[in-house]
Regions:
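Hydrophobic protein-protein interaction segments
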Residues: 2-143
Length: 143
């Protein structure tokens, strides 16, 4: 359903790249600043665990270079592990969507993280998702 909500991410992309480099992220994610700052703090935490990971270092450098907000948050030296959160998004067809997010580090491989989005019922997100899923299957491009 990610594609139905946010559109197709380019091959080889990541959600972090989408957050900082695709203008659609700032339009669709209502609490973008909160999630972007938390993403920077999580990247700092990952760098502490994997200081010699060249791909991670390159990603962090790219984000800090291309996005002034990311550079500012990086300089605050915040570190954040993955945690529970709520994310609100706006879709141009169905309106606001609200999700609870649970992040779990897998016990046998702490380098892999399971992120589960569940629909918050108060905004009717659960009712809107089947429509978005069927709309996405029909091959619509992101609006």
């Amino acid at each position: 359903l990610l594609t139905a909500v946010l559109g197709e991410l380019p091959p080889g992309s990541s959600f972090v790249r989408f957050m900082f480099f695709d203008p659609l992220a700032r339009e669709r994610i209502v609490n973008w600043e909160h999630f972007a700052a938390a993403s920077v703090a999580a990247l700092r935490g990952e760098l502490g665990r994997h200081p010699h990971d060249g791909l991670l270092v390159a990603l962090i450098d790219e984000i800090r270079t291309r996005d002034q907000d990311a550079a500012t948050w990086w300089n605050h030296h915040g570190v954040q592990d993955y945690a529970s959160a709520a994310k609100r998004m706006v879709h141009p067809v169905v309106g606001e969507l609200s999700f609870d997010i649970e992040t779990v580090m897998l016990p046998h491989n702490t380098d892999q993280v399971l992120v589960a989005y569940t629909a918050q019922p108060d905004l009717g997100t659960a009712r809107k998702l089947p429509f978005l899923a069927s709309w996405s299957v029909q091959g619509s491009d992101r609006p």
